[in-house]
Amino acid sequence: MNNKINNIKITQVKSAIGRKYDQRLTLVGLGLNKINKSVILENTNSIKGMVEKVKHLLKIENM
């Protein structure tokens, strides 16, 4: 079996200023708080849902 875990690299490209409170909390939950900060996370359903909520503020790359 292939036990390889898919990861995604998420980079914040737009500011959270002026966004809804829940979108700002979602960015914090993803580990993002500054423009151009990147994190590498496992590609799980919960992470996909969080990314979908704020995808207009992010750049997403598969790894």
UniProtKB/Swiss-Prot annotation:
GO CC, alphabetical: cytosolic large ribosomal subunit
BP GO terms, sorted: translation
Molecular function as annotated in GO: structural constituent of ribosome
Keyword Lipoprotein recorded: no
Alphabetically ordered keywords of this record: Ribonucleoprotein, Ribosomal protein
SUPFAM superfamilies cross-referenced by the UniProt entry: Ribosomal protein L30p/L7e (SSF55129)
Entries under Pfam families matching the protein: Ribosomal_L30
InterPro entries attached to this UniProt entry: Ribo_uL30_ferredoxin-like_sf, Ribosomal_uL30_bac-type, Ribosomal_uL30_ferredoxin-like
Subunit composition and interactions: Part of the 50S ribosomal subunit.
NCBIfam families: rpmD_bact
Family: Belongs to the universal ribosomal protein uL30 family.
Designated name of the protein: Large ribosomal subunit protein uL30
Species the sequence originates in: Rickettsia felis (strain ATCC VR-1525 / URRWXCal2)
